[in-house]
Amino acid sequence: MSTLASPLSIAGTRQSGASVRTQNVMAALSISNIVKSSLGPVGLDKMLVDDIGDVTVTNDGATILRLLEVEHPAAKVLVELAQLQDEEVGDGTTSVVILAAELLKNADELVKQKIHPTSIISGYRIACKEACKYISEHLTAPVDELGRDSLINIAKTSMSSKIIGADAEFFSAMVVDAAQSVKITDPRGQAAYSIKAINVLKAHGKSARESVLIPGYALNCTIASQQMPKKIVNAKIACLDFSLQKTKMKMGVQVLINDPDKLEAIRARELDITKERINMILGTGVNVVLVSGGVDDLCMKYFVEAGAMAVRRVKKSDLKIIAKATGAAFITSLTNMDGEESFDASMVGEAAEVAQERICDDELILIKGTKARAAASIILRGPNDFYCDEMERSVHDALCVVKRVLESKKVVAGGGCVEAALSIYLENFATSLASREQLAIAEFAKSLLVIPKTLSVNAAKDATDLVAKLRSYHNSSQTKPERSDLKWTGLDLIEGVVRDNKKAGVLEPAMSKIKSLKFATEAAITILRIDDMIKLNPEDKSGKSYADACAAGELDG
């Protein structure tokens, strides 16, 4: 196919042909190479410094790619792919990018051998469908058989590559307890785990092992006045997304007064409106008011007199979660549809206790025994802010993984086990097809081996030797029925040997593997379909400015 770079009638250039596809593949590979060395339990971290000097130290694929300022449109597809994996599954962001880039590289080789991209796309789709089916039918194990230990092992596997890998035993138990404490059952009897109801707070100082799990939702706020009660049992909670301040006339309102007494009457009415508003809230039995804005001295006085607790400057995201957990309404204004102010008992949430407690070195507001759904908090300790930020990302990934496993009830063995098994299966499956798709499926099978190879290289082990052993074990498990137990074989990257990873407790959610295969395949196909790139020239901004035009008298009517 000839390569053209021709000017267009519009202000831009058009590139078409093989060079566009090769450029896209090279861009994808360069993104993959950035995150490649951070894969696995012995992967390395990246230090990213942004344009204002903020430093981030992480080996989370999605975070690394989010902080990069990527310009190439094909590379942006991989960045978005990592974000999608992070939102959908929470873990496996690095491996999904590496796999997509490898699929593209091998597809480009086939295109150079004069195989049409449509045949490759068709083959990739067949391979992805067969791979997902094979995982579901042959490579998954139900969690119920393995019990709580399997959940701890899954969290540990997720954390093994992170900065808290040394304390994975401690944190994995904490994460599993936190996830199980926020379990809710819907009317159909299905369990769901809302990990948004787990608030992760960071406080630097002390060691990582002094992090704590607290029953109840912790807020990094304190009561508005020291005269307010610090503990309220059987709390009735109002969640207000506005400030409670003395009512003043709107800007631009002008009042002409001849008599000074009338000015005093206006001030008195302003005070009365504020008092009526506070009494309307307290009249429904509310004794805890959470406000996203400020609370002025006048309002504070009324709350203190009523023996109620007010907490100001609560983050809006926290306020929404508390409203959901306590059954309260998230109120943005007291004004109803008729333009009148109202507040009734149906807008009030309930909790067993709201108290201000000193946890670690900080005063926090703790909301315990929420009525509608449970809530929990994890307070992370670490030597500095970089460490605490990376701990938070690690705990978030582990929580997501545990949630997925608890909801789907299926796990697979980790350490390159799934990829090696699929590689053998798809190679054999490819030979059963008598069409051009056979070549694409064989390349798909070859691409999957990039995960065990990268794991071995990052662990400073002999990748060729280890992957060859792994493939021979999986080949035996698929061809000899008496050796079917070998299907759980994966890599032990510390010892540099092959072992049964199901027994060793290296487990991952089946959903994570299936979704990453689907996402990587779709991303590769999206880039593979492109054979033309039209780039518009940037707008010329060298014209006259508004000030110049005025000075020249060009804008005069």
Curated annotation (Swiss-Prot):
- Give the range the annotation lists for the signal sequence: none
Major location category of this protein: cytoplasm
Report the GO terms under cellular component.
Answer: chaperonin-containing T-complex; cytosol
Where is this protein found?
Answer: Cytoplasm
Q: Which residues form a coiled coil?
A: none
Pfam families on file: Cpn60_TCP1
* InterPro entries tied to this protein: Chap_CCT_alpha, Chaperone_TCP-1, Chaperonin_TCP-1_CS, Cpn60/GroEL/TCP-1, GroEL-like_apical_dom_sf, GROEL-like_equatorial_sf, TCP-1-like_intermed_sf, TCP-1_chaperonin
List GO molecular-function terms, semicolon-separated: ATP binding; ATP hydrolysis activity; ATP-dependent protein folding chaperone; unfolded protein binding
- Could you tell me the Gene Ontology terms of the biological process aspect for this record? follicle cell of egg chamber development; protein folding
PROSITE patterns for this protein: TCP1_1, TCP1_2, TCP1_3
* Entries under CDD domains matching the protein: TCP1_alpha
Question: Which key words tag this protein in UniProt?
Answer: ATP-binding, Chaperone, Cytoplasm, Nucleotide-binding
Q: What role does this protein play? A: Molecular chaperone; assists the folding of proteins upon ATP hydrolysis. Known to play a role, in vitro, in the folding of actin and tubulin.
Oligomeric form and interacting partners:
Heterooligomeric complex of about 850 to 900 kDa that forms two stacked rings, 12 to 16 nm in diameter.
Similarity comment text for this entry: Belongs to the TCP-1 chaperonin family.
Q: What is this protein called?
A: T-complex protein 1 subunit alpha
Supply the source organism for this entry: Drosophila melanogaster
Task: List the top taxonomic levels of the source.
Answer: Eukaryota, Metazoa, Ecdysozoa, Arthropoda, Hexapoda
